[in-house]
């Protein structure tokens, strides 16, 4: 083997192989859900969506997605919703950060006001 070919093979062997992302995938009426799964190869993000029907009733959905569109509130439905994405194994296991929940307080109050 030529020295150049040997060098190329050594460099290629040192490169990390692309691995599928592991995400929690579930839908749960409550605070959180955990169900680790291996995502398809073309998936780049783990996504968590929380839909608030009332301040005390929500649905949590977690999935593998190829693209991410993070939202705080879509503005068209009567339910408040948050979506967050991340890009490392099982990163969507924890709940959304407290500041995001606090940011939803005015939306939740407006939703409640509209229901009355």
Curated annotation (Swiss-Prot):
Pfam families: Toxin_TOLIP. GO terms for molecular function: acetylcholine receptor binding; acetylcholine receptor inhibitor activity; acetylcholine receptor regulator activity; ion channel inhibitor activity. GO terms for biological process: acetylcholine receptor signaling pathway; regulation of neurotransmitter receptor activity; synaptic transmission, cholinergic. It is a lipid-anchor; GPI-anchor. Residues 21-105 form the UPAR/Ly6 domain. One of its GO terms (cellular component) is endoplasmic reticulum. The keyword Signal applies. A lipid is attached at residue 92 (GPI-anchor amidated asparagine). Keywords: Cell membrane, Cell projection, Disulfide bond, Endoplasmic reticulum, Glycoprotein, GPI-anchor, Lipoprotein, Membrane, Signal. It is found in: Cell membrane; Cell projection, Dendrite; Endoplasmic reticulum. CDD domains: TFP_LU_ECD_LYNX1. Gene3D superfamilies: CD59. Disulfide bonds join 23-46, 26-33, 39-64, 68-85, 86-91. Residues 93-116 form a propeptide. It comes from the Eukaryota. Residues 1-20 form the signal peptide. Interacts with nAChRs containing alpha-4:beta-2 (CHRNA4:CHRNB2) and alpha-7 (CHRNA7) subunits. Interacts with CHRNA4 probably in the endoplasmic reticulum prior to nAChR pentameric assembly. Interacts with KCNA2/Potassium voltage-gated channel subfamily A member 2. Acts in different tissues through interaction to nicotinic acetylcholine receptors (nAChRs). The proposed role as modulator of nAChR activity seems to be dependent on the nAChR subtype and stoichiometry, and to involve an effect on nAChR trafficking and its cell surface expression, and on single channel properties of the nAChR inserted in the plasma membrane. Modulates functional properties of nicotinic acetylcholine receptors (nAChRs) to prevent excessive excitation, and hence neurodegeneration. This is Ly-6/neurotoxin-like protein 1. It comes from Pan troglodytes.
């Amino acid at each position: 083997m030529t020295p150049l070919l040997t060098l190329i093979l050594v460099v290629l062997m040192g490169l990390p192989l692309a691995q599928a992302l592991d995400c929690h995938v579930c839908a749960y009426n409550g605070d959180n859900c955990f169900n680790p799964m291996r995502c398809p190869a073309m998936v780049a993000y783990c996504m968590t969506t929380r839909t608030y029907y009332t301040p005390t009733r929500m649905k949590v959905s977690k999935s593998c997605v190829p693209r991410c569109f993070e939202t705080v509130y879509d503005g068209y439905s009567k339910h408040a919703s948050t979506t967050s994405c991340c890009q490392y194994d099982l990163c969507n296991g924890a709940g959304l950060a407290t500041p995001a929940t606090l940011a939803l307080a005015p939306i939740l109050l407006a939703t409640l006001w509209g229901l009355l």
